[in-house]
């Protein structure tokens, strides 16, 4: 499977909530770099920690946080950049913006993730401290 195919499986699993596909696609030792200056920002180590973070994101967003579009998949060796659109809503705040997910593929799985947001201030406000 090519790095782009693996990236597409990751995005599909994230969009549909397919936990089995996510577990097959993301390395148990994934390193996740969450941008910004909010309660989720920083580096998270391992699938369990990332899963817990995403679970809390879903709680905060009342289940609305989602990748709504993934348009371009661009490969450079073991790296794949994906242009995305993501959003969510919670009482008093809305998240709606473009971003880039930069994925490092190793041994057929997503091994490292760097996320980029087009409006970091909006994202920080949405997630809070």
Model-identified regions with their sequence ranges:
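Short, low-complexity N-terminal intrinsically disordered segments enriched in polar/charged residues
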Residues: 1-29, 129
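Short beta-strand segments enriched in hydrophobic/aromatic residues
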Residues: 26-27, 86-88, 117
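A solvent-exposed, acidic/Ser-Thr-rich amphipathic alpha-helical stretch
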Residues: 27-76
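Short, cysteine-centered beta-strand-loop-beta hairpins and adjacent loop/turn segments enriched
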Residues: 62, 88-95
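Hydrophobic/aromatic beta-strand elements that line small-molecule binding cavities or substrate pockets
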Residues: 67-73, 85-87, 98-103, 114
